[in-house]
Regions:
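Acidic/His-rich, divalent-metal-binding segments that scaffold phosphate/diphosphate chemistry
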Residues: 1-107
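An active-site-proximal "capping" alpha-helix that borders the catalytic cofactor pocket
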Residues: 69-72, 114-131
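Histidine-centered active-site/metal-ligand motif
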Residues: 65, 100, 117-118, 149-150
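Metal-dependent catalytic cores of enzymes that make or break cyclic nucleotides
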Residues: 109-113
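Secretory-pathway/luminal and periplasmic proteins that interact with or process carbohydrate-rich
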Residues: 101-108, 151-157
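Histidine/acidic-rich helix-loop-helix segments that form or flank divalent-metal centers
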Residues: 93, 133-195
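Inter-helical turn/loop segments and adjacent helix faces that build the functional surface
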Residues: 80-84, 129-136
Length: 197
C-alpha cells in the first residue's frame, strides 16, 4: 500500500480467512489477496454509486461489499438445512468470494468497472497457480465460480456475451451472495472495515 500507516493488504480480510477451515487454502487466499491491485482496498464498490448500498459507496467500499458477500455466504454455508456443500467446497467458495472483484477496475486502475473483471481476476489466479497447491478440480471450481459471478449480466455494452452464466449450484451460490451483498436495501453497520456483530 502507499503509506506505512495503512494496513497490509492481507490484513483486510483477517476475519474472513477464519471461515476457511483448511490451513493451506487459507494461506493460498492470503497469497492471492496480496497479489490484488492496491486500488481494490481503497475504492468504492461502484464507480457511479448506482449499483451498491451506501456502506459500499465510499472509501474501502469494495472491501466492505466483499466482506458482506463473504458474510452472507458464511451464514448460508453454516446452515446445513440450506446447502449440502462439503467442507472443501465451502473453503473454495469463501476463497472465490474474497477474490471475486479483486480486479474490478483492471490490473492497473481504470476509471470505471471493467466488464470482464471476473476473467481478469481469474487470469491472475491462473498466473499464480504454481505457487498454490490446489488440485485441478479445486482450481477449476475456483475459476468457474469467479468467472460466472455476474450472473445474467454477462454481456458487454455492445450486447456480446463475454462472461459465462452460472449453471451449477456452486456458480449460482457465489452469484447469489454477490447479488445480495449489492442490494441497496442492505444497511450493514461497520466498525472501520469490519462488520459489526
Amino acid at each position: 500500500m502507499l503509506g506505512s500507516d495503512l494496513m497490509e493488504k492481507i490484513e483486510y480480510f483477517n476475519k474472513e480467512y477464519s471461515y476457511i477451515k483448511d490451513n493451506k487454502k487459507r494461506e493460498h487466499v492470503k497469497y492471492l489477496v496480496n497479489k490484488l491491485p492496491d486500488y481494490f482496498f481503497e475504492i468504492p464498490a461502484s464507480s457511479t454509486g448506482k449499483y451498491h448500498p451506501s456502506f459500499a459507496s465510499s472509501e474501502n467500499g469494495l472491501v466492505k461489499h466483499t466482506k458482506v458477500a463473504v458474510r452472507i455466504a458464511k451464514e448460508l454455508l453454516d446452515n446445513s438445512g440450506l446447502n449440502n456443500f462439503k467442507d472443501n467446497e465451502k473453503d473454495i467458495i469463501i476463497m472465490a468470494i474474497i477474490l471475486h472483484d479483486g480486479c474490478k477496475s483492471g490490473i492497473v486502475k481504470e476509471n470505471y468497472t471493467r466488464f470482464d473483471h471476473p476473467l481478469i481476476v481469474s487470469h491472475l489466479i491462473k498466473e499464480n497457480r504454481s505457487s498454490l497447491s490446489l488440485n485441478d478440480e479445486e482450481m477449476d471450481l475456483l475459476i468457474r465460480v469467479i468467472s460466472s459471478h455476474m450472473g445474467i449480466w454477462n454481456k458487454d455494452y455492445n450486447g456480446n456475451e463475454i462472461l459465462p452464466i452460472p449453471k451449477d449450484k456452486y456458480q449460482r451460490f457465489v452469484h447469489m451472495c454477490d447479488y445480495l451483498s449489492s442490494k441497496k436495501f442492505l444497511d450493514v453497520k461497520f466498525d472501520g472495515i469490519d462488520i459489526k456483530d
